[in-house]
Every structure is written in structure tokens, then in C-alpha cells.
Regions:
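Conserved beta-strand -> loop -> alpha-helix junction used to position metal-binding or nucleic-acid-contacting
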Residues: 109-124
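Short helix-capping segments at alpha-helix termini
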Residues: 24-26, 105-112
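Acidic, Mg2+-coordinating catalytic module of metal-dependent nucleases/exonucleases
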Residues: 77-98, 102-103, 132-186
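Conserved non-catalytic scaffold segment of RNase H-like nuclease domains
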Residues: 1-100, 144-146
């Protein structure tokens, strides 16, 4: 796969992050796990600069993908996992498809136990409702587009770090809380 990071490489997951929130969109639990790549053993400078995750971080705090995925599944439990893919529909798996790709990549059994939904489709509807002009966005850009990035300053992270990105999604959901009330029913 051609990817701008370092020629032809597999899309190995290096970080999985997720939040659990209550009905008022307050964080009740946080999941953040680094994964040690098995194929692309050295993270490219592009990736390190993009995410702020270093090779030392992965070596010291990372676990193999299979362990990280099992921990992630345990964290999610029976809840719906909302991820973000700008060009996808609400029913699309988005990040779930990347996790499934990594299961295949590592020869692990397919797993459909986690239910994924694409929250970007809801953001598009809300942006249209409030005339927020956005032609595309990544999950980490949500709080910046809304001028709310100061709310995430204490994370000391930036866009494309998965933990920052999930907090950025939550920042947007909180900003438009009434419009995202549908998430409480899922």
C-alpha cells in the first residue's frame, strides 16, 4: 500500500485509544494502548512527526497488537464504538475496518464482536444545520474547526495522536450536545 510515510508498507496499528462517556458526555474511562509493529519495525520520521509517538515510546509502552486488541475489546464490552471517517456513512466501521485489516495482517481470527459506527456522518449533518463550512476533516481537527482546541491543551498532544483525536471528537459532541443526543440511545 502506498502511504506517504515510507513507500509501500502495511497499515499496522501503532495506537488504539477510546473513551467511555456517560449520558452527559463526561469521560468515565479512558483507553490508550501503544502497539509494537511486527512488520514495519521502525516508525518513520513522518509518522513520529505526525503523531508525536516515538520508537522509544513504542518499545517501552507498546504491546503486541493481539494483546492490545483484546484489551480494547474488553474496554468496549457491549458498547457501540464510534470512530471517524469523513467519507463514510453512519453504518461504516471506519477504524474498525483498520483493526480488522490488522487482524488479517497478523493471521488472527476475524472478529465482529465490536459494533462500530461512523460519527463523521453525524458531524456532517450538524455542520450543515449550523452552516459550519467544512469540506473534509480528520477527527483531530474537530475541536480546532470549532475554535475549541484550548479545551484539549492539558493533553499536551496534537492531532493524529489517537488519544487526542478521540478527545477532539468528544469536544465536538459536547459542543453540539443536543444534536448528538441520539448517541445516548445507541
Amino acid at each position: 500500500m502506498q502511504n506517504g510515510w515510507r513507500g509501500l508498507q502495511k497499515r499496522e496499528v501503532v495506537q488504539i485509544a477510546a473513551l467511555k462517556v456517560d449520558d452527559d458526555f463526561n469521560v468515565v474511562a479512558e483507553f490508550n494502548q501503544l502497539c509494537q509493529p511486527k512488520i514495519n519495525l521502525i516508525l518513520s520520521d513522518y509518522f513520529v512527526n505526525l503523531t508525536g509517538i516515538s520508537n522509544d515510546d513504542v518499545a517501552q509502552k507498546g504491546v503486541d497488537f493481539a494483546s492490545a486488541y483484546q484489551r480494547f475489546k474488553a474496554f468496549v464490552g457491549n458498547d457501540v464504538c464510534y470512530s471517524h471517517g469523513w467519507n463514510g456513512a453512519f453504518e461504516d466501521a471506519c477504524d474498525g475496518a483498520i483493526l480488522a485489516e490488522n487482524l488479517r495482517l497478523y493471521g488472527l481470527p476475524a472478529d465482529n464482536s465490536v459494533k462500530y459506527r461512523n460519527i463523521a456522518a453525524l458531524f456532517k449533518q450538524v455542520y450543515q444545520k449550523y452552516n459550519v463550512a467544512v469540506s473534509s476533516q480528520s477527527s483531530g481537527q474537530i475541536c480546532k474547526i470549532l475554535g475549541l482546541q484550548q479545551q484539549l491543551a492539558d493533553l499536551h498532544l496534537d492531532e493524529h495522536n489517537a488519544l487526542y483525536d478521540v478527545y477532539s471528537i468528544l469536544c465536538g459532541v459536547r459542543h453540539f450536545a443536543d444534536d448528538f443526543a441520539i448517541l445516548k440511545q445507541k
